[in-house]
Regions:
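A generic local structural motif
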Residues: 156-158, 214-218, 238-239, 260
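Catalytic binding pocket for nucleotide-activated donors in carbohydrate/polymer assembly enzymes
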Residues: 221-333
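Charged, often glycine-rich, active-site loop that binds/positions anionic groups
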Residues: 129-134, 214-222
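A Trp-anchored, charged/polar loop motif used as the substrate-binding/catalytic surface
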Residues: 145-157, 213-214, 225-226, 232-235
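Short, solvent-exposed loop/turn segments at secondary-structure junctions
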Residues: 120-123, 175-179, 208-212, 235-237, ...
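Extended, non-globular alpha-helical segments
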Residues: 194-219, 272-274, 278
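Active-site-adjacent structural elements in folded domains
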Residues: 155, 211-216, 269-271, 288-290
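Secretory-pathway glycan-assembly enzymes, especially type II membrane glycosyltransferases
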Residues: 2-209
Length: 333
């Protein structure tokens, strides 16, 4: 059994299907090691060119969504006191936040000030901050979204299986405890408790300490042999939502409460994903419905693919990121 477990771990490491961290770190450090003058020239050139492109409306719409700041609503003295100059920005504890934000910020004058808030941000800061995530509800203007921790969150797949070729089951693999405390991710815990052992579900928990539910991790490819994949929020958003929506399986989840660069707040229930109640009481009925109505299931998959396509153009993603920061610096100075 021990040998099988070791083999399984090795198989997962080699076939997880996740983004290569080595490649990510090499390209990120190359990007931020470029001279400031070169990055500044690149930013001005690429934005000037984009203004005459046919997707300028889409670009500006997304910039306004990520950055909702209005100068009149900002506590400027508090911002000036708390924010730091780009030239003084130290590397964050988890370097991905620094690398993903600074690759764009370095193209601006380095005396500009900002407040970079790393990690899973589930509250709204009291001054304008650059964040990965924010609550969908409430006045969230101070939470300015950038594409942070991209190596973990932004992953799309090429799914070779059609929806009709997949198993009529729901799959879930994930953590149900918080890595930094003894509390539980209550929504995930409730789901596992309710459905573990149900033959229509393949459920496993990857934390230690939940022996009755504990299983090995599954590769993305293994997830994709199921029609329905649970996308349950963890510390903030469900990090698997992007790759599920790029596949021929369907994301199943309650209404999201947090959003990131993926604009989860704009997703339409039962159009981009299957929405279930927060207590999961309608989950089995909804799964039955879409098993029996494969055309409607396929429509959701098609809409999800259209949605994901908006995020697939690397040049446009770069332009939007730079414009989000441009508005941030203009509004807060």
């Amino acid at each position: 059994a021990k040998k099988m477990k070791m083999n399984r771990k090795l198989y997962y490491i080699l076939h997880s299907g996740k983004n290569s961290k080595l490649r990510y770190y090499i390209t990120s450090y190359l990007w931020i090691s470029m001279p400031h003058c070169l990055l500044s020239w690149f930013r001005k050139t690429i934005i000037s060119k984009a203004q005459h492109g046919n997707d300028w409306d889409e670009i500006t719409k997304r910039v306004e969504y990520y950055n909702k700041l209005h100068r009149s609503e900002i506590d400027l003295p508090a911002f000036q006191q708390k924010a730091i100059k780009l030239s003084e920005q130290k590397k964050t504890g988890q370097s991905v936040y620094y690398l993903d934000a600074f690759r764009y910020a370095k193209s601006f004058p380095l005396h500009r000030k900002w407040w970079l808030q790393p990690g899973d941000v589930t509250w709204i800061p009291d001054i304008p901050a650059i964040v990965k995530s924010r609550p969908i509800k409430g006045n969230n203007a101070n939470s300015v979204l950038l594409k942070l921790d991209r190596v973990r969150h932004f992953l799309f797949v090429n799914d070779r299986l059609k929806f009709t070729e997949k198993a009529d089951k729901v799959v879930f693999r994930g953590l149900i405890g918080q890595f930094d405390s003894n509390t539980l991710k209550q929504n995930r815990y409730s789901f596992v408790k309710k459905f573990f052992g149900n033959p229509r579900f393949n459920i496993g928990v990857i934390d230690k300490g939940f022996n009755e539910w504990s299983t090995e991790k599954m590769t993305i490819r293994e997830h994709l042999s199921y029609k329905f994949i649970m996308a349950l929020e963890g510390n903030d958003v469900a990090s698997n939502l992007k790759w599920i929506m790029s596949s021929n399986s369907i994301a199943v989840m309650p209404h999201p409460t947090y959003e990131t660069w993926f604009m989860e707040g704009t997703l339409i229930p039962d159009y981009h994903y299957i929405e279930v109640k927060a207590d999961y009481s309608d989950l089995e009925a909804k799964i039955d419905y879409y098993i029996n109505h494969p055309d409607e299931a396929q429509s959701i998959i098609n809409h999800a693919h259209e949605y994901v396509d908006r995020f697939r153009n690397p040049q446009r993603e770069c332009i939007i990121s730079m414009l989000v920061l441009d508005k941030y610096f203009r509004t807060t100075q």
